[in-house]
Each structure stands twice: as C-alpha cells, then as structure tokens.
C-alpha cells in the first residue's frame, strides 16, 4: 500500500533498530523534508524501531513525529519531519526532551530547536494533550455564567471539547484569549460545535 497522496513525495524507509534510525537522522541534510517511517506491528515478528524509539530519535535530532497511517498487514507508517521554525511543542514532547537531555542522548540539532523554542516562548507555551487538557479558570467562569453553554460544553465529545481548550490555550494575547472565550461560549449557548458530527453517526443533539 502506498503512503497517502498528500505526502507521497516523501521516501518510505524502515529501520531494524533505534541506532540505525538515529544514524539515518544524523546523516540528513538541512534540506531534508522528512520521511514516512515504517514501524513493524508487534505481531509481525519483524525487527523494527518502535514508536517510542522513533519519537525519541526525532526529538534528539530536531525532528517531530506526525500522522500515522496503516501500510499493510505488517507495518504502520508514521510521518516524521524536521520541526518547523515556529512549530508548537506539546507538553508530552517537552517532558520527554528533558528526559533525553538527562540521559545524554540529545543531539546538537535537537538542542538548537529547544533553545529556539525557549527564546520565542513556544517552550513555555507547550500545549497539553487531549487526555491531559483541563478547563482553565477563565473559561470555566464564563461557562458558569451561561448555564446553556455550560450544559452543552459538558455534553461535547472529546474532539470538540479539545478543539475549544486548545484554541483558548493557543491565544497569544490576553485580549485574543478573552475574545475566543466569548465566541465559544456564545457558540455553545446556541448548541453549535466547532466540528460538526459525522453524518454516519446519530449523536445526541445539543440543546439550549
């Protein structure tokens, strides 16, 4: 099975070990645009770099993992690319990067990305994953003042809930954050969501 058409220009590679994977990363030129990395499924019995090893290697060399797709009966594909100049950091990757530094594994390219993120504020502004995200106090207060919005927020699926929390967190200025909170509370009070429900499902309708 071929990789997704949207990124079919990237090479598809597999590596038997984390050492092979990191050696490949270290040899990549600055002009590299990324790779579709093949990760063998556990039941395949094929020697392969694991997903965590793939992520660790990417972080150490200033790269980042992304989309995951099915490849065939034995492999998954994960898209791994150099981190973009203003690419956001997740709290999970930030914490893992600190572990890799303590272990002495972080490479120069990876440290440069960390230093850049610290200088421009992206390191401090790292976002929580969907499973770890919490409702901030200012959003909670706004919801509490609007019972209809609060009720509909509590009924959101995890995708729509995280969509709001992420966008509020991602606001760069206090006034932008306040505007977003106001907009989402108004949206919720009308029973609307950021991501409409799939037509293939019949979810419970949000009510005012």
Model-derived features: where do they sit?
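Charge-dense, helix-prone N-terminal extensions
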Residues: 1-208
């Amino acid at each position: 099975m071929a990789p997704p058409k949207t990124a079919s220009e990237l090479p598809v590679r597999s590596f038997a070990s984390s050492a092979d994977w990191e050696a490949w990363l270290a040899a990549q030129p600055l002009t590299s645009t990324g790779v579709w990395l093949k990760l063998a499924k556990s039941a395949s019995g094929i020697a392969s770099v694991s997903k965590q090893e793939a992520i660790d290697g990417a972080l150490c060399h200033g790269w980042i993992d992304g989309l995951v797709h099915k490849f065939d009966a034995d492999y998954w594909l994960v898209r791994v690319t150099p981190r973009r100049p203003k690419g956001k950091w997740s709290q999970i990757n930030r914490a893992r990067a600190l572990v890799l530094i303590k272990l002495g594994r972080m490479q120069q390219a990876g440290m440069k990305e960390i230093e850049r993120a610290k200088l421009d504020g992206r390191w401090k502004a790292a976002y929580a994953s969907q499973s770890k995200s919490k409702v901030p106090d200012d959003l909670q207060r706004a919801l509490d003042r609007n019972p209809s919005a609060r009720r509909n927020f509590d009924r959101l699926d995890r995708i729509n809930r995280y969509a709001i929390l992420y966008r509020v967190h991602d606001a760069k200025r206090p006034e932008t954050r306040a505007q977003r909170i106001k907009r989402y509370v108004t949206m919720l009070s009308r029973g609307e969501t950021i991501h409409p429900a799939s037509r293939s499902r019949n979810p419970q309708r949000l009510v005012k």
